[in-house]
Amino acid sequence: MGRKLYYVLATLQLVAVFLFCGGFFPQKVVLKNDSKFIVNPEVQLASKPVFKKLVLVVIDALRSDFLFQKDSSDFEFLHGLLNSGEAWGYTAYSNPPTVTLPRLKGITTGSAPNFLDAILNVAEDDTSSNLKEQDSLLKQFHTHHYKMNFFGDDTWLKLFPLEFFSEYDGTNSFFVSDFEEVDFNVTRHVPYQMEHQKNWDVLILHYLGLDHIGHKGGSKSHFMPSKHREMDSVIKQIYEKIDGDTLMVVLGDHGMNDLGNHGGSSSGETSAALAFLSKRLKKYQSSDIQQSSNVPVEDAHPDYKYLKEVEQIDIVPTLSMLFNLPIPKNSMGVIIDELLQLLPSKLAAIKVQDNYLQLTKLKPGYEAQLEKKSAGTLLEEMREIQSSLAMAATNYNYTFLTYGTTLMIIGTLIVTVWNFQLSQEYIEHVGTSVLLGISMFASSFIEEEHQIWWWITISVLLLMQISNGKKLVVLSGLRLIRGWNNSGQKYIYDNVLHTLLKSHTSVLWWLNVVTFLSVGFPFLRNKDESEKMVSLLSVSFLALSSITYKICFAIVNGDKVPSGLYTFALRSCAMYLANENATESDISQCLVPIARIFFQICGVSIIILLFMKYALNKSTNMLNKLLSVIKFVLLLQTSSANIPLFLIFEILTSVTPDITPIFSLCLQNLTFFQFGGTNSIATVNLTNAYNGVSSNYNIYVVGVLMFLSNYAPSIYWALSLIPQSYKQKTLRLQHYYITGTCLMIACIALRYHLFIWSVFSPKLCYYAAWSLYNVVMDFAITLLGVL
C-alpha cells in the first residue's frame, strides 16, 4: 500500500470514529424554562418551608460503607446521630458514569447523566456543560432569593453562574496528589460561616480529599481512617452550631471500587452514602431498616447496600419539598417518603401529586391520573416511571451514526482488499481481528477482553518460527505478566504477584532498581571515550533522578520502602532543600522539583544524542539510546508495583529481538490489560498524571502524562517495531478497522441494551483512545526510524 493511501485511510478512520461518537454521545435535549407549582399553586405558594437554611456537605467518593459499616467507617459523631434518630441514612444509587460532573448534574437537576459528561469531566476549562439555562435546585434557590455560599470543588463554579453565589472559593478537583490542603482550603471557611449564619441561606461545601486518597491508595488506604475522622469533626463542628431550622445533608457524589477509582457501574462505584441531619428528625420515624439497625453495621455487604436504598436524584424533589420550591423541570427524582412526615398531611399529598405530574411530563404519551390514588400508590407508580425514563435518556443522532459506520465499512473493504495475501501473517492478523470483532457483540467479552488477548497471544507465540527453548522463556515471561495484576471487571483475586510484592517491599524495590539499571544498558555501548563519558553521565542522572522520585513518591504516599533506599531519598531531599535536618515530612516538597529535573535531564539527553550524531558524527547505538530515554519516562509514569514488569519486557525483547507485527499487536493489548487496564472508565489511572505538575493545573500537560501512564506498556511494545514498513502498519490499521466496524454495528444494534452505558459506551471511548494512540505511535515510530 502506498504511503499516501495509508495516511488517507488512517485519517478516514479517525474521522469515522469521531463522527460516530458525535452521533452516539449527543448533548441531551432538556426542557427549557423554569418549573412552577402544578397542583394547587396558591396553597403551595402560601405554605412555609419546613427548614429555613440548608447545609449541603458533599464528600467526594463517599461510598456507603464509609458511613455505615463498622470495618470501613470512622464517622463516630455521625454514627451517634444515626442511632439517636437525629440523622437518617440511606444508600443512594448514583447512575453511571460515576464521575463528579454528571453526578453533580444529577443531584442538582434530578436528570439522568449524559455519558459525554464523563469525558468533559477532565476538561478544566470546559463550559459546554454549564447549567445556566437549565432548571436546577440551585436556580430555584436563586430565583426565590436564597443567599448561597459555596466552598470546594470548582466544578460547581463551572456548572453554575457565579451570580448564584454570594461568596465562593473553588479548589482544583484534579490535583489528586493533594488530599490535605485541598480540604483545609474548604474547612478554613467553616468557622466564619458558622459565626455569620445570617449571611447565607444555603451553604455548600464540597470536599475532595477522600476521593484523592482513593485514587492514590485505594479504598483501604491507611490514610482513609484519619480522613474519615477529619470529615466527621467538620460535620460535628457544623452540626453543633446550627439550630433546628437548618437541615444538614451529607452525601457522596459517587462511590469507588477497591482500587479507589470510579466512573463505571460496579456496586462500589454506584453506592454513595446519604444522610439527612436535623435535631427535628428525632420526633419522627426513620426507615424501618434504620430503626432495626445499629450503626455502624457489623456485617459487610458485597453490594454496599446499607440501610434503605434510594436513587441519588431523589434528593432533588425531596429538598424542593422541604424548602417549598418547584421541582426542577427535568428532574426524574421521586420524593423520599420518610421525609413526607415533616409536612402536614394535606400539604404532603399535594407535594406528591405535584411530583407525579412533573415526572409524567417527561414521558411523552403517558396518561397521568390522580383521581382516587393514595400518596403511596403515586410514589410506587413514579418509581416505575423513573425506571423507564432512565432507560431511554438519550437521543441518538442517526445521521452521524450512519456516516461514521459507512466510512468505517468503506475503509475496511479498501484496506482488506489492498492487503489480501495468502500468508500465515495475514491469516493470523485477519483471524485475530475477526475474533475480536465478534466479541464486541457480547458485554461479558468486552468486560473480560484480556482473556481473549491472552488466548490469542499464546496461540501466536506457538506459531512463531523460533526455537522451543525461546518459546519456553517467552511463555514463562508471559505467565508472570498474566499473574501480576487483577484484570477485567468481573473477578478479583487476592494472590496476584502485585499484592505479594507489596507485602515484601525489599524484593519489590530491589527489582525496581535492577529494572531502572537494565533500561540504561544501551548507553554503555560506545566506540570512543568521549561518547562513553557523555553516555555514562546521561544514564547516571536519568537513573538516579527517576529512582529518587519513585522512592520519594512512595514515602509520601505512606508505602514502605527498604531502610537503605529511605535513607538515600531523605539525604537527597536534604541536599536539594539545603537542610541537613530534613525529615520525612519535608520529602513532599521535593516531589515536583525532582520530577521536573528528571524531565529536563531527558530533554538534555536527547539534545546531546542528536548533537553527537549530526554535529560530531558519533552515533553508536543512537536509536537504542533514544529508546532508553523514552523507557525511563515510561518507568517514571508507572506505579512502583508494576515497574518490574518492564524487566520481564527487556528479557523478552532480548530473547526475540525480531518481534513480528502480529505478536507486537498482541503484546500491546495484552500488557495494557495486565497492567490493570480495562474497558471501564473506572480504571483510568490518574495517580501518575501529576508527576512534576504543581497546583497550577494544566490540562494539556496532565493529559500527556495520563496518556503515558495508562499506555506505558503498549508504547513499549509499539516501539519494538522500529523501523516499520508500511505493510506492517497497514496490517495493524486493518485490525482496528475490522474491530471498529464491528463495535459500531454492535453499539447501534444494542443501543437499548441494559449495559449500553456501563459497558459498550466506555468501550467506544477506549476505541477512540486506541485510534489516537495508533496515530501518535505511528508518528513517533516514523520519526525515530528517520533519526
From Swiss-Prot:
GO biological process: GPI anchor biosynthetic process
EC number: 2.-.-.-
Matches recorded under Gene3D superfamilies: Alkaline Phosphatase, subunit A (3.40.720.10)
GO annotations of cellular component type: endoplasmic reticulum membrane
InterPro entries: Alkaline_phosphatase_core_sf (IPR017850), Phosphodiest/P_Trfase (IPR002591), PIG-G_N (IPR037674), PIGG/GPI7 (IPR039527), PIGG/GPI7_C (IPR045687)
Subcellular location: Endoplasmic reticulum membrane
Entry keywords, A to Z: Endoplasmic reticulum, Glycoprotein, GPI-anchor biosynthesis, Membrane, Transferase, Transmembrane, Transmembrane helix
Chain ranges passing through the membrane: 400-420, 426-446, 455-475, 504-524, 536-556, 591-611, 629-651, 671-693, 699-719, 740-760, 767-787
GO molecular function: CP2 mannose-ethanolamine phosphotransferase activity
Pathway terms, separated by semicolons: Glycolipid biosynthesis; glycosylphosphatidylinositol-anchor biosynthesis
Pfam families membership: Phosphodiest, PIGO_PIGG
Membrane topology classification: Multi-pass membrane protein
SUPFAM superfamilies: Alkaline phosphatase-like (SSF53649)
Sugar-modified residues: 33, 185, 397, 485, 581, 617, 669
UniProt keyword annotation of Cell membrane present: no
Keyword Glycoprotein: yes
Alphabetized PANTHER family for the sequence: GPI ETHANOLAMINE PHOSPHATE TRANSFERASE 2, PHOSPHATIDYLINOSITOL GLYCAN-RELATED
Family affiliation: Belongs to the PIGG/PIGN/PIGO family. PIGG subfamily.
Function of the protein: Ethanolamine phosphate transferase involved in glycosylphosphatidylinositol-anchor biosynthesis. Transfers ethanolamine phosphate to the GPI second mannose.
Protein name: GPI ethanolamine phosphate transferase 2
Organism: Kluyveromyces lactis (strain ATCC 8585 / CBS 2359 / DSM 70799 / NBRC 1267 / NRRL Y-1140 / WM37) (Yeast)
Gene name for this UniProt entry: LAS21
